[in-house]
């Protein structure tokens, strides 16, 4: 891959002390202490699975929390001001978990309208849905909840392939540069990450009966398939699929094997629908993916929840942002804080 200059913004989880903690020689058995990757810089807001959109010279940050709050800042380092909430009551989607606390939002601006795709689910379950809400401005005005775009393990069209094998969480959005057709990416574990075309109004699938879904990533030879949280970006002439690989959180009962925690990986293709390959030309559909950022310095653990802000012009870098656990404080994922790090050359 050609060299691309990325400015990365990261989100650090601040921990309220809770066992278990590795000590002494146990540290190197749990996470990487290498200093070959840079540490992030402070950004001053709590967030997990952050989502950031730029509009009218400001950054707007959305995060999973009750009623899905969003914040505004003139700079990625803050200070961040609470603007409002996407919801003032539970989602209109029925029979799914977290209806009052949607997960993993992705907000985009399209033709003068803001669309917030959100997740309803419970941890470790396929009984999930991705919904969408809209507004015309990010000034705190009311949003309209349009309900589910896709549902899995129960709900409308959940028996249609591939909804009968996938997990409807972690939505992201991309538009084909040539055709201007818009696509929704989704998926977590089970059969990993998928994509389908959206209707012209971006509120539903283009064809619910025959959704024309394609698989973007897959781990074929292992029982566990820990890929999720995908994001797709375009950097001429390639589309890039970024995703989290490994275990994200809930380490109170123990840690995964070293290197099996979250890391950020990527593949690329000239076609928005793939197939995607990594730096070594391995297919993402065959377990490939170049590691971009992973646990490091004995402080950064399990980075993931990735998103990309495009550069404002050809001379500015794209921004890759994410969260991680700050191991100098602890290992639970109760509170998090965004940070930025310096520029790095990525292949």
Residues of each region from the PLM?
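Fungal secretory targeting signals
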Residues: 1-20
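Carbohydrate-active catalytic/glycan-binding domains of CAZyme proteins
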Residues: 18-347
């Amino acid at each position: 891959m050609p060299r691309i200059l990325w400015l990365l913004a990261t989100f650090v989880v601040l921990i309220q002390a809770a066992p278990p903690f590795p000590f002494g020689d146990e540290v190197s058995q749990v996470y990487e202490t290498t200093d070959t990757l840079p540490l992030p810089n402070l950004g001053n807001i709590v967030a997990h699975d952050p989502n950031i959109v730029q509009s009218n010279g400001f950054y707007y940050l959305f995060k999973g929390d009750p009623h899905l709050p969003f914040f505004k800042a003139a700079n990625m380092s803050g200070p961040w001001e609470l603007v409002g909430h996407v919801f003032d009551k539970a989602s209109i989607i029925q029979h799914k978990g977290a209806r009052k606390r949607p997960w993993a939002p992705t907000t985009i601006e399209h033709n003068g309208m803001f669309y917030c795709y959100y997740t309803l689910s419970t941890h470790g379950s396929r009984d999930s849905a991705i919904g969408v809400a809209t507004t015309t401005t990010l000034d705190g005005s009311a949003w309209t909840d349009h309900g589910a775009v896709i549902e899995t393990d129960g709900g409308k069209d959940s028996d249609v392939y591939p909804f009968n094998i996938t997990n409807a969480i972690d939505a992201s959005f991309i538009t084909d540069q040539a055709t201007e057709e818009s696509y929704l990416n989704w998926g977590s574990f089970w059969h990993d990450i998928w994509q389908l075309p959206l209707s012209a109004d971006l509120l539903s699938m283009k064809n619910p009966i025959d959704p024309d879904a394609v698989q973007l990533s897959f781990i074929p030879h292992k029982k566990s398939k820990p890929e999720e949280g995908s994001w797709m970006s375009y950097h001429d002439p390639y589309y890039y699929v970024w995703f989290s690989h490994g275990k994200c959180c809930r380490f109170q009962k123990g840690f995964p094997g070293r290197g099996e925690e979250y890391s950020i990986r990527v593949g690329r293709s000239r076609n928005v629908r793939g197939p995607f390959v990594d730096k070594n030309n391995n297919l993402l559909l065959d377990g490939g993916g170049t590691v971009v950022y992973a646990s490091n310095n004995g402080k950064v653990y399990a980075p993931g929840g990735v998103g990309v802000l495009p550069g404002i012009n050809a001379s500015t870098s794209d921004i890759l942002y994410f969260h991680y656990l700050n191991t100098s404080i602890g290992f639970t994922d109760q509170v998090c804080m965004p940070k930025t790090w310096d520029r790095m050359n990525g292949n």
